[in-house]
């Protein structure tokens, strides 16, 4: 199999700094990289694993590896494409399980804590939110994160109880 990998990335991120840097580093290792929008991939399941990938409607050989870079925009369809590569035995850098794990911020913290890594005190809040309870267990200032979001979206700093209460009123 030739030294070729695919970076799965949506068109709008093809020219991003991160994508360009990854491509440069792969090229330094003499690895040919193809940027592929995962939404341009069609898959079908067969027992031979041959020609079960189409890109823009054309049969395609499987790459040597796949590097998903789809972030919080990873849909069920994109995860199905990633799982298809896994089933075919194609190494996937950032497996479908890893993608599921990082999409859930609380679960990510639980995994890190289980691995004895230092993490900030973290709690899942339910409504109605008891500000005294938060103050007793976390304190202020506190970082407040929404359940989903990436690239810094959905992350807020509440330096005081008052700011925390204001954040809650916006939710």
Feature locations, PLM:
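Active-site nucleotide/adenylate-binding loops and adjacent lid/helix of ATP-dependent enzymes
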Residues: 2-9, 19, 60-61, 85-89, ...
């Amino acid at each position: 199999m030739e030294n070729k990998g695919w970076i799965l990335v949506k068109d709008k991120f093809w020219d991003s700094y991160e994508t360009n840097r990854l491509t440069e580093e792969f090229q330094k290792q003499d690895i040919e990289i193809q940027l592929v929008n995962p939404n341009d991939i069609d898959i079908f399941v067969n027992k031979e694993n041959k020609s079960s990938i189409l890109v823009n409607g054309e049969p395609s050989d499987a790459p040597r590896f796949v590097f998903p870079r789809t972030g919080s925009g990873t849909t069920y369809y994109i995860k199905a494409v990633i799982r298809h590569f896994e089933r075919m035995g194609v190494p996937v850098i950032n497996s479908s399980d890893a993608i599921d794990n990082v999409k859930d911020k609380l679960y990510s913290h639980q995994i890190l804590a289980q691995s004895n890594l230092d993490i900030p005190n973290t709690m899942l809040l339910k409504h109605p939110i008891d500000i005294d309870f938060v103050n007793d267990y976390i304190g202020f200032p506190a970082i407040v994160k929404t359940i989903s979001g990436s690239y810094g979206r959905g992350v807020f700093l509440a330096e005081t109880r008052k700011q925390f209460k204001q954040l809650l009123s916006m939710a």
